[in-house]
Structure formats: structure tokens, C-alpha cells
Amino acid sequence: MNMLSEAAVEKALDKKMNEVSYKMIGKDVSVYYGEKRALYDVNLNVRENTVTALIGPSGCGKSTFLRTLNRMNDTIDGCRVTGKITLDTDDIYDQQIDVVELRARVGMVFQKPNPFPKTIYENIAYGPRIHGLARNKADMDQIVEHSLQKAGLWNEVKDRLLESGTGLSGGQQQRLCIARAVAVSPEVILMDEPCSALDPIATAKVEELIHELRTNYTIVIVTHSMQQAARVSQRTAMFHLGHLVEENETDKMFTNPDDQRTQDYIMGRFG
């Protein structure tokens, strides 16, 4: 009996380890800009500690969906979102949700590097200061150093912390923006074409960083580069004309997709 019980426990543990853990769940998500409908009943679950790439031709709705995940669409006049999106168990569109806190939990890195017109140090310290994450300057110094290390930037800027963040190269600025997002201890990091304005060397550094960040964060990235999606993601979702066409393991999406539209897009037959 004991042996059977132990075997049952081991089987249960194995099953638990193999269970999929979803960090964010989107159910029947539609987005309207005034009378124009941009997304149609999207159902997409984002796996925890996984890089999920959103691909599709321009105007397909991938960036629109990305912005629903931390309510960035709230900043657009006339934008309306229906359906339900949860972060863990929290409905992020519930009226009781603190949007500032939500955007700390779900950070965003934009297409064009947008450092604040402040010192490198203050770029990182700004968010933790607002959210009360540091009790004193020593705490803040540690957060700044840790965040810059996470973004692979510390060794390049540790002697220049009081210089302006806008004086960095484009690739360094983007990593500074990633460090700024990391500084408030997010659970999810959204990236909207983070490498489109960067040269190949800077792009390689950001992609390497994405691989490292996946250990501690859930990442959703919009990219127009099929090669980048294949390199950095474990899951890929294909959008077309406001619809989610399919979502699957990246390897399968690029070798044997279920939908012909995905195959055509990946092969460059439309875009």
C-alpha cells in the first residue's frame, strides 16, 4: 500500500510539473477604435516564464492586442475593449483595478527607445521611487545596479550614471528602457518591436537579454522579423485582419503550421 501511495504521489508530482501555467488569459477580446473594429473575439493564453511572439502583416492587430495586456489602449480616445483578460486571477479591466499598479506588474518596452530626459540613474530610480520600493538611498542604489545588470548594461554605464540617458547609443537606450521596466519588479514584460530601430549588433544583445529575462519574467513580443520570432520565442501567435489565426509552439508554427495563412505569411507570400 505504501509503495502504491508513493508511486501515486510521484505520478501526481510529475503531472503537476508537466501542467501548463498561464500568466495571462485573454477570452473573447475585441477592440474598437470608434466604429472601426480592430480585433475580433481573440482567445489567447500567455504561458508563464515563456516568450510568446505575436506575428502577422502590418495592421493585423498584434500590437493592438499587446496593448490590451496592460491597458495602454486606455490612452487612446474612442478606444473600447470587450471580453476579459486576467493576470493570474485578476480581471485587469475590472473597475477596481489600479491601472498604475497594473502597468508596474505588466511593463512595456516600446518600438523606439524612449529614455526620460534625465540621468541614467534617474531613469531607473523614477519608477521605484513612485511605487515606494526603496526605503533609502542605499536601497535605491541597489535597485539601480541590479536593474542595469539584469539588462546587461551595468558594466557599460556604471561610471556614467549621472550622465543623460539620451546620450547613450540606440541599443544602449533600449536596454536602459528594459532596465527601467525591470526596476519595478514586473511579472510580465511586453515588447513592441523592440529591435526595429536597432542595428544587428544591438539587436543580438537585446535578443540575448530576452533569453536571460525569461527565467524570471513572462515576455510577449511583437515582431515583424520571422527570424527573430524563431530565435527568441517558445510560442508564436499569428494574427491576420484582426483575427487570431493560430497559436502554437514556435518550432511547429515555422515548420508545420495548422493554417494555410500562417504558411503563406511565413513564406513571404503576403505581408
UniProtKB/Swiss-Prot annotation:
It catalyses: phosphate(out) + ATP + H2O = ADP + 2 phosphate(in) + H(+). It is a peripheral membrane protein. The keyword Repeat does not apply. One of its GO terms (molecular function) is ATP hydrolysis activity. Its main location: membrane. Pfam families: ABC_tran. Part of the ABC transporter complex PstSACB involved in phosphate import. Responsible for energy coupling to the transport system. This is Phosphate import ATP-binding protein PstB. It comes from Agrobacterium fabrum (strain C58 / ATCC 33970) (Agrobacterium tumefaciens (strain C58)).
